[in-house]
Amino acid sequence: YTQFEWVEAGIGSTGTTPGSFRLQHDILSKGKVDLLFVEAAVNDDTNRFSALEQVRGMEGEVRHALESNPEMDIVMLHFIYDPFIPMIARRQMPDVILNHERVANHYLIPSINLCQEIGERMQDGEFTWDDFGGTHPKPFGHKFYAAAIGHLFDEMWKGVSPAGTIEA
């Protein structure tokens, strides 16, 4: 089995602009990074970063990471929070996710749109927002996040570059 050394560098309520400035000190300075997860849809939205700031911030994180290790694998995640739920119900993707996806597409980074998946599952009556645990999920909600990441890894290990949304 692969031995992992985890660097937990998440700071709540920040987003990509502060994240791009913190990346070197809080993550890259700890040693060679082989796998990096990035997620900021909720905080870039709540902090009201402009579309340009969202793209620049996410690209700042991705580009700086790849400059430090061009072989680094990056996975972009898109989480869900209350204001995104009615948008997903109307089949409207939040602008912040579209902006971050511009960066993912440019750098050919796989992404997992958990916002869409969780929103659609709630629309289908599979569970409620309260069951899921809200913006900071309960263990029940985390199972969906973990399953989606596992599914992405399964697809990538098969040598498949997933097109579209990866689901749990």
Q: Where in this protein do the model-derived segments appear?
A:
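Alpha-helical cap/lid subdomain in secreted, periplasmic
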Residues: 2, 20-165
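A short beta-strand-loop structural module common to alpha/beta enzyme folds
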Residues: 2-15
